[in-house]
Amino acid sequence: MTESVRLPVARLKPSTVALPGSKSISNRTLLLAALSDNACEIHSLLKSDDTDRMLEALDKLGVQIEYLAEDRLKVHGTGGRFPNRTADLFLGNAGTAFRPLTAALAVLGGDYHLHGVPRMHERPIGDLVDALRIAGADVEYLGKEHYPPLHIGERQDNGERVIPIKGNVSSQFLTALLMALPLTGQAFEIRMVGELISKPYIDITLKLMAQFGVQVINEGYRVFKIPADAHYHAPEHLHVEGDASSASYFLAAGLIAATPVRVTGIGANSIQGDVAFARELEKIGADVVWGENFVEVSRPKERAVQSFDLDANHIPDAAMTLAIVALATGQTCTLRNIGSWRVKETDRIAAMANELRKLGAKVVEEAEAIHITPPETLTPDAVIDTYDDHRMAMCFSLVSLLGVPVVINDPKCTHKTFPTYFDVFSSLTETAE
């Protein structure tokens, strides 16, 4: 039987939340540190299913890792060559581990088997594999063409130095290629084919690579130039920012409940694109205060939450939270340019539409957009399915701030990025039933 949690009608208390470390930054940092020519102590690392899969994989590849505290460890770099050239790697449903490791191992060569949970085998990887093959990599599909699981063999340097890659399905493919190609020591040019989605995630990658000593020239997100003789050299200490996507639930709560909520671990200078979520809240009625290491959202009770029609390509993960905020507006709201939702942990457009309808909302689903019209009164005690998707569970917790209780199935799916989410959420609220 599916485990579930019932959230009663809740009242938000003025609150401060210390965010867990960013998933995107944590897994990129672990891989870059493992490929560096020195040791790196990483602080505030996210403890979650996705980072556990990356750490397990690095261990199987022969990387020495010292666990110093719950959220602090030291990675001893391998100088850009993993000691173990044969490994069977199970990577769960962790795209931030699967895609970058695929590219790094394909560029280095060896005898590797990469696989995950059934949903991971439904998430496309063909655009990345096509690019890696142009660079001489030996990557074989073990099941359906263009999807994991994969076998990786020895790379043959074919002299090709200009690599085209599509960027309209997932920016993680470009991230993976950017992080892997410096391991060759050769100069490369990566050329985008068609539109590149989720550019802020590429900014995270480029900024982290620079912190590890590799400067990539970005020519308008169309061409990326990797210098010859590049190698990774880690900072002695690196602090992982709080997760800006996870911040979205608490910031949205502050707007919905007209109660001040401060999140710490991100701020005005964050390298994560999802901090722009707070700016979107500002446009629809929030008061936002920015600090160096915090963002605070509130709303005067007399000011209504405004409806919106938003191109959300720049904040694909945090935009899911806006689908719940739409219920507080009383008017039709639209999220556009969210086609990447279809190939995430689940088909998030379909999942979001299904579950919003259980609350009484009218939802029109398009290939790359969703239109949400809230009902006069939300349906109480709706049972929300979460599709093994951490963000579905966290988003729908906010319904309890809208005057109705809600039941969330499989709340433990938040272990992917935020294992303590429901404990933290309940600590910020009091029952109003």
Swiss-Prot record:
It catalyses: 3-phosphoshikimate + phosphoenolpyruvate = 5-O-(1-carboxyvinyl)-3-phosphoshikimate + phosphate. Pfam families: EPSP_synthase. InterPro entries: Enolpyruvate_Tfrase_dom, Enolpyruvate_Tfrase_sf, EPSP_synthase, EPSP_synthase_CS, RNA3'P_cycl/enolpyr_Trfase_a/b. GO terms for biological process: amino acid biosynthetic process; aromatic amino acid family biosynthetic process; chorismate biosynthetic process. SUPFAM superfamilies: EPT/RTPC-like. Its EC number is 2.5.1.19. Disulfide bonds: none annotated. It is found in: Cytoplasm. Its main location: cytoplasm. 3-phosphoshikimate binds at K23, S24, R28, S170, S171, Q172, S198, D317, K344. The active site is at D317 (proton acceptor). Keywords: Amino-acid biosynthesis, Aromatic amino acid biosynthesis, Cytoplasm, Transferase. GO terms for cellular component: cytoplasm. Phosphoenolpyruvate binds at K23, G95, R123, Q172, R348, R391, K416. One of its GO terms (molecular function) is 3-phosphoshikimate 1-carboxyvinyltransferase activity. Pathway: Metabolic intermediate biosynthesis; chorismate biosynthesis; chorismate from D-erythrose 4-phosphate and phosphoenolpyruvate: step 6/7. Belongs to the EPSP synthase family. Catalyzes the transfer of the enolpyruvyl moiety of phosphoenolpyruvate (PEP) to the 5-hydroxyl of shikimate-3-phosphate (S3P) to produce enolpyruvyl shikimate-3-phosphate and inorganic phosphate. Monomer. This is 3-phosphoshikimate 1-carboxyvinyltransferase. It comes from Neisseria meningitidis serogroup B (strain ATCC BAA-335 / MC58). The lineage of its organism: Bacteria, Pseudomonadati, Pseudomonadota, Betaproteobacteria, Neisseriales.
